């Protein structure tokens, strides 16, 4: 959903993902007591402080925050109350490591919040402004073979490599 909102191609994602921060842990337990609007106040403070802290730590700005909410456990009410935009469900993949996605078949709800005026326009631009370029992952060269050839290469290697663990 995020890539569709921002009109990112598959090749642009690795170049621009560094401009998006994931808010992966945010929960206010009921035992905290009753504080009106506590969650939306905390989210507002996070969004005010995050850009400066991020740039200080990583050396480049961050333009968008995205949390993934498990709809089987939570409703995302705090994000709705804080004015974040719900983009819909993910495809059910979970990031494991820098470039490895695991299919969990458990879609999450994706919410986004732009950090500052013009953030979405910058992220959607055909060319990133110079201050945002060069910080993402460099693009790998295009693979000069077709996917059918890649599958046959995989089969070729798989048939010829043995797992040394089976010797025990």
Model-identified regions with their sequence ranges:
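Acyl-donor binding region in acyl/amide transferases
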Residues: 1-117, 128
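Secondary-structure boundary/capping micro-motif
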Residues: 20, 24-28, 50-57, 74-77, ...
């Amino acid at each position: 959903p995020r890539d569709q909102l921002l009109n990112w191609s598959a090749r642009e994602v690795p170049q621009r993902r560094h401009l998006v921060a994931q808010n992966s842990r945010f929960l206010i337990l009921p035992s905290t007591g009753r504080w009106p609007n506590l969650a939306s106040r905390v989210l507002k403070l996070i969004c005010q402080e995050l850009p400066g802290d991020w740039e200080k730590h990583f050396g480049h700005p961050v333009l968008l925050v995205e949390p993934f909410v498990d709809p089987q456990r939570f409703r995302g009410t705090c994000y709705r109350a804080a004015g974040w935009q719900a983009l819909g469900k993910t495809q059910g993949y979970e990031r494991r490591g820098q470039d490895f996605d695991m299919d969990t078949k458990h879609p999450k709800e994706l919410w986004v919040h732009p950090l500052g005026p013009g953030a979405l326009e910058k992220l959607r631009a055909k060319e990133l402004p110079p201050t945002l370029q060069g910080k993402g992952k460099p693009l790998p060269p295009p693979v000069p073979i077709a996917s059918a050839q890649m599958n046959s290469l995989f089969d070729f290697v798989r048939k010829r490599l043995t797992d040394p663990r089976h010797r025990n």
